[in-house]
Amino acid sequence: AQGFERLNPNGYFKFNAADSIMTRAPENATTAPIPEGFAPLVAGGPYIQHNGPLDVLHQGNVVKFGFRVEPRHTSPMGNLHGGMMATFCDMLVPLSVHRKSDQVSNRFLPTISLQIDYLAPAPLGAWVEGEAEPLRITRSLVFAQGLVTADGVPCARVSGVFKIGPVAPRDAVE
């Protein structure tokens, strides 16, 4: 494969960026403005503050979360790293449920199970945006699903099961 060189006979490869066929985003790709209506998300704690920033749009019953793919979010191929997508999805789904359900709006929702189907890459500079909906809320569990797009193109489908935990600190759910 162009852009890779074999490291050893066991089949491990080393990425060689100088020979890569990947396209590079324009220099201003990660400084493009966030879409109108989005504002910085305050919730999430130190982990999200370090790995974000994430933005939220909340208008009526529409709740969307998003972020711009920065170089620090990318894999060696120049696309959003799957781990960052998983982090985003793990914030998207429970926080969407908080905003769409009075039953659990102030409760911590630790993840029991998170299923992500990666549909397409999200390149450097892309605006990644997601929406999620609660499917069912029981006495102790929340079932929810969502869709994530990159510049409007579906890039991940997510579903999750979350435990209804104790009342959460205010900055964890807002």
Task: Please report, for each region that a protein language model flagged, where it lies by residue.
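Terminal targeting signals and extreme-terminal segments of soluble enzymes
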Residues: G3, F13-E174
